[in-house]
């Protein structure tokens, strides 16, 4: 992908920064996953860590899709693979990312669970 000035996408400092942030968020998700597994193995129950993970994972998947859309440009809209790109898989991944934000409880429900069980906030009315 190239910018309107003819530069490559990788020359876009903002895009590189965004990719770096995504890499850090993915590392944090991996650490959270290991913590959740350890807690479940120790206590025999998954706890609310799964809700925290689901929220973070849904958000990172959306951000990753946004960056991919910028890189793929118009090809991101096609279900057919174009020019050797597997953009059909990208489109399926984008749709799957949307379904993840609904599966196992909407993002708002997961936020309520975290607020009540982790942060000790009162139940939403």
Predicted regions and their residues:
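Alpha-helical interface subdomain recognition
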Residues: 1-125
């Amino acid at each position: 992908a190239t910018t309107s000035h003819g530069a490559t996408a990788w020359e876009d400092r903002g895009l590189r920064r965004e990719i770096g942030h995504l890499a850090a968020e993915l590392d944090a998700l991996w650490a959270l996953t290991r913590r959740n597994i350890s807690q479940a193995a120790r206590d025999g129950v998954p706890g609310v860590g799964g809700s925290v993970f689901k929220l973070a994972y849904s958000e990172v998947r959306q951000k990753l899709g946004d960056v991919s859309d910028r890189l793929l440009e118009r090809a991101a809209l096609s279900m057919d693979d174009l020019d050797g790109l597997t953009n059909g898989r990208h489109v399926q991944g984008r749709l799957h990312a949307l379904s993840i934000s609904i599966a196992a409880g909407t993002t708002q429900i997961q936020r309520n669970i975290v607020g009540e069980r982790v942060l000790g906030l009162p139940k939403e009315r």
